């Protein structure tokens, strides 16, 4: 029995959130979540990459890399990681040019983190999970979009909490990343409550 698109989407956003369930993409999650505006921009960027890269990699895997896809008896699946990274690198370069042209302030704010999206583990993880679950092209698009929106929800929530924490009296030993890690852990516990949902 195949899952409905709504089930795949809700699972990707809430139940199997890339940042708060699998802890993927934590480098940018922690570094860019200081301001809601910046977190929103990065969240949109990651969502766009996931919505494009996951189904694109699905097509490449299904029609080229999978065993017997091109020729009977030929299995090119050992090339999947390097191929997926190549696709991500090309998409990130295109996205970087678009941001530099149309949103220069966001491009400047993201700075060094933009090229790192090529090997962003949440984006790469979504592609690997898509292959393992044998999603179709449309399911891959829904899953990639859901993963991106879930990651965006998590980073915006963290940024909002971090903005509020600026005005809090935090013990000296927990200031900085200490309280951020604790907050991420508590957010993760909150998202674990969705794991009981049967869709």
Curated annotation (Swiss-Prot):
Report the subcellular localization: Cell inner membrane
Q: What is its EC number?
A: 7.2.1.1
Topology in the lipid bilayer is annotated as: Multi-pass membrane protein
Which residues span the membrane? Answer: 12-32, 36-56, 78-98, 111-131, 141-161, 177-197
Q: Does the keyword Methyltransferase apply?
A: no
Signal peptide annotation: none
What GO molecular function terms would the record report?
A: oxidoreductase activity, acting on NAD(P)H, quinone or similar compound as acceptor
Which UniProt key words apply to this protein?
Cell inner membrane, Cell membrane, Ion transport, Membrane, NAD, Sodium, Sodium transport, Translocase, Transmembrane, Transmembrane helix, Transport, Ubiquinone
**Annotated S-S bridges:** none
Q: Which reaction does it catalyse?
A: a ubiquinone + n Na(+)(in) + NADH + H(+) = a ubiquinol + n Na(+)(out) + NAD(+)
- Family recorded in the similarity comment: Belongs to the NqrDE/RnfAE family.
Q: What does this protein do?
A: NQR complex catalyzes the reduction of ubiquinone-1 to ubiquinol by two successive reactions, coupled with the transport of Na(+) ions from the cytoplasm to the periplasm. NqrA to NqrE are probably involved in the second step, the conversion of ubisemiquinone to ubiquinol.
What's the protein name? Na(+)-translocating NADH-quinone reductase subunit E
User: Encoded by which gene?
Assistant: nqrE
């Amino acid at each position: 029995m195949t899952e409905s698109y709504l089930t795949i989407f809700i699972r990707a956003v809430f139940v199997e959130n890339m940042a708060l369930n699998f802890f993927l993409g934590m480098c940018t999650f922690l570094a860019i979540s200081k301001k809601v505006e910046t977190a929103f921009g990065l969240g949109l960027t990651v969502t766009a990459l996931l919505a494009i890269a996951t189904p694109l990699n699905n097509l490449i895997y299904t029609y080229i890399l999978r065993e017997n896809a091109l020729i009977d008896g030929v299995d090119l699946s050992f090339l999947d990681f390097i191929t997926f990274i190549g696709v991500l690198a090309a998409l990130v370069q295109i996205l970087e040019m678009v941001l530099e042209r149309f949103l220069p302030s966001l491009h400047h704010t993201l700075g060094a983190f933009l090229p790192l999206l090529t090997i962003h583990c949440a984006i790469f993880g979504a592609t690997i999970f898509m292959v393992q679950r044998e999603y179709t092209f449309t399911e891959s698009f829904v899953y990639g979009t859901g993963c991106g929106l879930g990651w965006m929800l998590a980073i915006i929530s963290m940024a909002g909490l971090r903005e509020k924490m600026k005005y809090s009296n935090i013990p000296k030993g927990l200031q900085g990343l200490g309280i951020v890690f604790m907050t991420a852990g508590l957010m993760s516990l909150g998202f674990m409550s969705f794991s009981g949902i049967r869709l």
